[in-house]
């Protein structure tokens, strides 16, 4: 069953954290959940071509902290911070709490599963060969230190009448090992032949001991076995 379970959800609380961190009373839970959905939908729609990999949302009683992880922070911030002020003002419309917006850079976008999936999707839209896109992404990922990568593409590949699934794997992808740091993401490419689905698994090593971080107030991996 290891191959059928979402690797991120499978490891939540073990070596992965939640993208939304807050506590709410029963009457407020639904409202906060909808607010999170609207915030992420706005960022995905309006912050385009900026390499946004994920959006972290943390809440206190009267504040909402939104952290955007991106490989191109300059595109998100804009000239003299003009774009980030616009994003902050628009996000304030989705919640009654004060919004604090932070931008964090993704150092190695080639080893980030979501950014790799989006990159392949963009190449497929431009009619680049799916095999070339897959192999190029895998080579870049392994060259920058990943221990293994698996790429799966489904749909009318090459414009064929019958949809099929093709996948490639290099290195190790230990699906059942909970201490394995596996990044997983999905993306869709809207082509003239229909939607093509892309799934990415990236294995970065094994996480062993953990320690408490005073800075982030979270339990973080202490050592990753290379």
Curated annotation (Swiss-Prot):
Function: Binds the lower part of the 30S subunit head. Binds mRNA in the 70S ribosome, positioning it for translation.
Quaternary structure annotation from Swiss-Prot or TrEMBL: Part of the 30S ribosomal subunit. Forms a tight complex with proteins S10 and S14.
InterPro entries, per the entry: KH_dom, KH_dom-like_a/b, KH_dom_type_2, KH_sf_prok-type, Ribosomal_S3_C_sf, Ribosomal_uS3_bac-typ, Ribosomal_uS3_C, Ribosomal_uS3_CS
Domain KH type-2, first and last residues per copy: 39-107
CDD domains xrefs: KH-II_30S_S3
GO MF, any single term: structural constituent of ribosome
Alphabetically ordered keywords of this record: Ribonucleoprotein, Ribosomal protein, RNA-binding, rRNA-binding
Protein name: Small ribosomal subunit protein uS3
One GO-annotated biological process of the protein: translation
PANTHER family cross-referenced by the UniProt entry: 30S/40S RIBOSOMAL PROTEIN S3, SMALL RIBOSOMAL SUBUNIT PROTEIN US3C
Similarity comment text for this entry: Belongs to the universal ribosomal protein uS3 family.
Presence of keyword RNA-binding: yes
Coiled coil feature spans: none
Pfam families hit by this protein: KH_2 (PF07650), Ribosomal_S3_C (PF00189)
UniProt keyword Plastid present: no
Disulfide-bond pairs as recorded: none
């Amino acid at each position: 069953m290891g191959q059928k379970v979402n690797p991120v959800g499978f490891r939540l609380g073990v070596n992965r954290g939640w993208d939304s961190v807050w506590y709410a009373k029963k009457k407020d839970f639904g409202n906060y959940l909808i607010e999170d959905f609207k915030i992420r939908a706005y960022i995905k729609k309006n912050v385009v071509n900026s390499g946004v990999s994920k959006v972290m949302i943390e809440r206190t009683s009267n504040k909402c902290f939104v952290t955007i992880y991106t490989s191109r922070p300059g595109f998100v911030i804009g000239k003299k911070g003009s774009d980030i002020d616009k994003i902050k003002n628009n996000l304030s419309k989705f919640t009654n709490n004060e919004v604090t917006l932070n931008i964090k850079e993704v150092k190695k976008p080639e080893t980030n599963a979501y950014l790799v999936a989006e990159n392949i999707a963009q190449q497929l839209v431009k009619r680049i060969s799916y095999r070339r896109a897959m192999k190029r992404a895998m080579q870049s990922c392994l060259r920058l230190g990943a221990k293994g990568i698996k790429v799966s593409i489904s749909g009318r590949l090459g414009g064929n009448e019958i949809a099929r699934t093709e996948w490639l794997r290099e290195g190790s992808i230990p699906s059942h090992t909970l201490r394995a740091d596996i990044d997983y993401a999905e993306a869709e490419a809207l082509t003239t032949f229909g939607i093509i689905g892309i799934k990415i698994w990236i294995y970065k090593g094994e996480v062993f001991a953990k320690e408490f971080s005073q800075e982030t107030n979270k339990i973080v991996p202490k050592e990753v076995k290379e």
